[in-house]
Amino acid sequence: MNNQKTALILDAGFASLPLQQAVKTAGFRTLVCSGKAHDAGMLTADITCEQNYADSEAVLKIAQQHKVAALLPGVTDVSYLSGCRVAHSLGLPGFDAPDVSDTIFLKDKFRAWALSKGLPVPQAAWTDEQARQLKLPLLVKPVDAYSGNGISKVTDWAMLDAAIETARNASPGKQYVVENFCEGALYSHSAFIRNGEIVCEFFVDEYCTVYPWQVNSSSLSQNLSPDMRDSVSECMQSIVSDLRLVDGLLHTQFIASEDQFWLIELTRRCPGDLYSRLIELSTGVNYAGWFVAPFLGKSSPAVPRRPVQTRNIARHTVSVNRAMRFTRFAFKSLPADLIEVIPLTRPGTLVQPAPGDRAGLIFAEFRDDAALRQMTPHLKDYFLLNTYEGHSDA
């Protein structure tokens, strides 16, 4: 009789594969739930269930049927929000309570909570009338969408109504938030929490060079000052303490100028597009293993608070600004070695414009940190698509 425990993973996308492997390495049988039967994770799981995991009642029945010992989110917000409700019902570890999760994940709730606490976030509004009290330019966002879907920049009041309609249409709940547009560079902060304290953290430079609201190039931060890192870290620790977050990952995108920063989005799921692999290649830290540990009832190992960057790694998501028929990748010369290329489509497939689609992921190792800093913002000019129509930039 097989006494191996079963872990249910709510995601089958390619970026969840490192999580699935980490769960297997920890000794669990993997049961993957997804509404997309052909996703990569459905091919590698021990057991599969074709079900839209946004339906938490259906997920609860699956978990009970298979008597799962652990439940994990993947790289989507929905996987965490659905999972936290099921875990709350079953008493499984790793998730915050549903009300805390909603505060973190839903943009309108987080903005309102953060403003009430005096945290550094853009000024926000939730109605047309309130929005007109803010100063231009503005960003209008759906409160519950992802990957930059439905976001518009408003530079003239005549644009506001259309931007609100775009956000509503992209929102499953038909809700939006309007906020001041903050000038600065985009970064992420990925922190692991243990016993209410941030014990390990990473800072990453992020660039949106194809679609303005979706990251496609990144590396461990070469630009953020030590003082700014400390300020962001202290701010995130205050959130951890205030919300009494459980052990695990807290991942944040923020914008910073030379002397101030603004929190943009927080999440407790694993960031997508193989962010875990970027950290692992750059520092040697088993990011995916650390992420899954609390959901399996385990602790992550003790390490330095800010692990040293040991390799000059850049990550690039190959995407396009107009529909293209994919045939193959092409690469221009760089002072770097291509160390991993992950195709996400097949020859002949029509790749849709970002943020709705991408053709592949590429990891490159630069020869020194100066080259990494200089070249990462420009990777879209070096990693290209070849199409039936001819040679085209990606």
Regions found by a protein language model. Give the residues of each.
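ATP-binding N-terminal substructure of ATP-dependent carboxylate-amine bond-forming enzymes
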Residues: 1-100, 297-301, 311, 320, ...
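Active-site nucleotide/adenylate-binding loops and adjacent lid/helix of ATP-dependent enzymes
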Residues: 101-177, 183, 194-197, 222-238, ...
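Short, well-ordered beta-strand elements within core beta-sheets of diverse protein domains
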Residues: 152, 180, 280, 360-367
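Short beta-strand-to-loop capping motifs
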Residues: 155-156, 191, 318-322, 362-368
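Phosphate-binding core of ATP-grasp and ATP-grasp-like enzymes
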Residues: 167-175, 180-222, 230-251, 255-263, ...
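A structural supersecondary motif
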Residues: 250, 335-348
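Gly/Ser/Thr-rich active-site loops/lids in small-molecule metabolic enzymes
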Residues: 279-293
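A glycine-rich beta-turn/hairpin centered on an aromatic-Pro dipeptide
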Residues: 296-337
